[in-house]
Amino acid sequence: MLHEEGAARRGELATAHGVVQTPAFMPVGTRGAVKAATARDLRDCGAEIILANTYHLWLRPGEDLVSRLGGLHRFMGWEGPILTDSGGFQAFSLGARRAVTEDGVRFRSHLDGSERLLTPERAVEIQAALGSDIAMVLDECLAQPAPLEQVRESTERSARWARRCRDRFLQLQASGAGTSRSGRTAAELPLADSPGAASVFEPLPLVTNPGQAQFGIVQGGTVPALRALSAERTLAIGFEAYAIGGLSVGEPAETMYEVVGHTAPLLPANRPRYLMGVGTPA
């Protein structure tokens, strides 16, 4: 934290691929590229961090291929920080083609109709293989308005999923992953058309970027009591930073501002805060 004035905060977010000045706006590179913009264009525009989409990269080209190509940074040609979402929002947006259970989200791919199951653990594993600098937990994002009991059940489920995400994340980080059986990192593995390409079939590291951080997400719809409950349970798990999710999904802008206003003070003052899915600067 560099400076505070009222509720405004000015800070720096340190990642394995550089420092981001906050507050920051993230251009969206859904499938690993920001449309109609090169990496140089983005730098010239002042972008310091890019968001990529786990759902789309998982379905095509797949996290294994991205990892084998050296991770998302090499795949995108972007040397700066990258944040990946969990893929949950896209899965939930499929409507009738998905079903939510305690295990996770079961859905059919919009590409080929194949059935997929996105669990909290799988969301962590995919993002670890992609090698982003910031990975998000899998949460349930309800469209608003929604019945109170449905919001309550969703909030509690998201808290349970957050614990499962954190447990898997810490397991991967503690496993010494980041190098393959030969001792090389994903970035050091030869590409298919390079000398030594036969060794491209050696087992891939589970973690492409050992410096990856994980953000927890506070849910709770537009209900202050449920926002407080979600914040309490998410903070009890312990993450590198915290996000406010479940907004800009159909509620009036005034309601969004109110929810942010009473949720932000519940988050630690010494940790970064991420307002998810809000694409119009206030």
Language-model segments: which ranges?
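Short, Lys/Arg-enriched charge-dense amphipathic segments
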Residues: 74-81, 85, 110, 160-168, ...
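Intrinsic disorder/low-complexity segments
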Residues: 171-210
